[in-house]
Amino acid sequence: METPTLNKSGSLTIVGTGIESIGQMTLQTLSYIEAADKVFYCVIDPATEAFILTKNKDCVDLYQYYDNGKSRMDTYTQMSEVMLREVRKGLDVVGVFYGHPGVFVNPSLRALAIAKSEGFKARMLPGVSAEDCLYADLCIDPSNPGCLTYEASDFLIRERPTNIYSHFILFQVGCVGIADFNFTGFENSKFGILVDRLEKEYGAEHPVVHYIAAMLPHEDPVTDQWTIGQLREPEFYKRVGGVSTFYIPPKERKEINVDIIRELKFLPEGKVPDTRTQIYPPNQWEPEVPTVPAYGSNEHAAIAQLDTHTPPEQYQPLATSKAMTDVMTKLALDPKALAEYKADHRAFAQSVPDLTANERTALEIGDSWAFRCAMKEMPISLLDNAKQSMEEASEQGFPWIIVVGVVGVVGSVVSSA
């Protein structure tokens, strides 16, 4: 299949507003809303809607395409198509969705795929998702001990596997098996089928956290801890709604592989690894997790070093001009300035007043390492090491920037790509 060329006028940028009203909207998202020719939005609180309307004069509410009993897939098709019609007219369109615009959102992904296939510029900007809020509010780390995330109906239909050693997050638990829409909410009559599966995997006594992220600044999140068995009782399941999420903590902790620990040389020779104990802090939602104390011998030793601490030789303090700070901020928050810079690095760099020579060179090069060297006070030893590794990469044909080993000075030697 021939790849379309990106030479058409018109573009589509998909952004997210986060979950909590207004405050979780990123600066990047706001800048694209303000710069758009036309904005389409689908948000769940009126304060965010009103805020969007103050940032652009041409806004359309996508929520109007929902209706009682109407297939959500039909709605999603219509939402994506009304955005695409304006892109095809040559407009720079922004689609705004609550949360992260690509997490449990269909019309955004559909519109992006079609726009790209037709040769238009199209991209998605990240936003704060309900899962991000859950991590923060429940104070859990998805990397420890890993995390599974499913949509509740899909979890049942496709018999998705669980992992009792990891965090488990289930979305859309308040509309199990429901494919249409209702302005008044969902009856959720198939909820018991989900409970059956959870009991089979974890047992009736295992904890489950009923979670709802705060949507308004003055609200607190819902973090009710129940047991899976309690989900069968009306007192509990009637509190599960369309924005409810379940978090199920690990049932057990998997022991480490001692042979792999030794092969990776994680511990000094002769030291026996602890196969069960977890680092501090423990997961407050998980039963019976053996955890080291907050202040053990290692922690006390580390804290004792604070009073005599000095920055290490390879620490890189900031050393940049106001002009460079301003231009980097402009590139981050002004889509039109960013487009100018991407079109011609050198011309843009030459147009910016009051830069140092190294800052201007970094702008012309456009490489992250060049920016770092121009904006940080770089120790000679670090630059020498970087120069050696980059020269080796350049010899192998990689398009690296070569940095000369002088503190704060960037060489503009660029190998051919």
UniProtKB/Swiss-Prot annotation:
What is the recorded post-translational modification?
A: LedMA automethylates at Ile-401, Val-403, Val-404, Gly-405, Val-406, Val-407, Gly-408, Val-410, Gly-411 and Val-413 before being processed by the prolyloligopeptidase ledP which likely forms a peptidyl ester upon removal of the follower propeptide, which then undergoes macrocyclization with the N-terminus of the modified core peptide. Peptide backbone alpha-N-methylations change the physicochemical properties of amide bonds to provide structural constraints and other favorable characteristics including biological membrane permeability to peptides.
Biotech application, in the record's words, is: Lentinulin A displays strong and selective activity against the plant-pathogenic nematode Meloidogyne incognita but shows no further phytotoxic, antibacterial, or antifungal activities.
- Read off the InterPro entries from this record: 4pyrrol_Mease, 4pyrrol_Methylase_sf, 4pyrrole_Mease_sub1
Q: Region (Clasp domain) spans which residues?
A: 252-378
**Which SUPFAM superfamilies does the UniProt record give?**
Tetrapyrrole methylase (SSF53790)
Per the record, residues carrying N-methylisoleucine are 401
In the UniProt record, does the keyword ATP-binding occur? no
Q: What Pfam families would the database entry show?
A: TP_methylase (PF00590)
Give the pathway listed in the UniProt entry for this protein.
Mycotoxin biosynthesis
* GO terms for biological process, alphabetical: methylation
Q: Extract the ranges annotated as region (Precursor leader).
A: 379-399
Where are the N-methylvaline modifications? 403-404, 406-407, 410, 413
Q: What is its EC number?
A: 2.1.1.-
Annotated region (Methyltransferase domain), positions in chain: 1-251
Q: Which residues carry this modification: N-methylglycine?
A: 405, 408, 411
Q: Which residues cross the membrane?
A: none
Annotated active site residues, numbered on this chain, are: 72, 76, 98
Q: Which UniProt keywords apply?
A: Methylation, Methyltransferase, S-adenosyl-L-methionine, Transferase, Virulence
Query: Where S-adenosyl-L-methionine is bound, by residue?
Result: 98, 100, 103, 130, 172, 213, 244-245
| Molecular function (Gene Ontology), one example | methyltransferase activity
Q: How does it assemble?
A: Homodimer.
Q: What does this protein do?
A: Fusion protein of the methyltransferase ledM and the lentinulin A core peptide; part of the gene cluster that mediates the biosynthesis of lentinulin A, a highly methylated cyclic dodecapeptide with nematodicidal activity. Lentinulin A derives from the C-terminus of the ledMA protein, and it is the ledMA protein that methylates its own C-terminus using S-adenosyl methionine (SAM). The C-terminus is subsequently cleaved off and macrocyclized by the prolyloligopeptidase ledP to give the final product.
Give the protein family.
Answer: In the N-terminal section; belongs to the precorrin methyltransferase family.
The UniProt comment on domains reads: Within the homodimer, the clasp domain wraps around the adjacent subunit to position the core peptide into the other subunit's active site for iterative intermolecular methylation.
Give the protein's recorded name: Methyltransferase/ribosomally synthesized cyclic peptide lentinulin A precursor ledMA
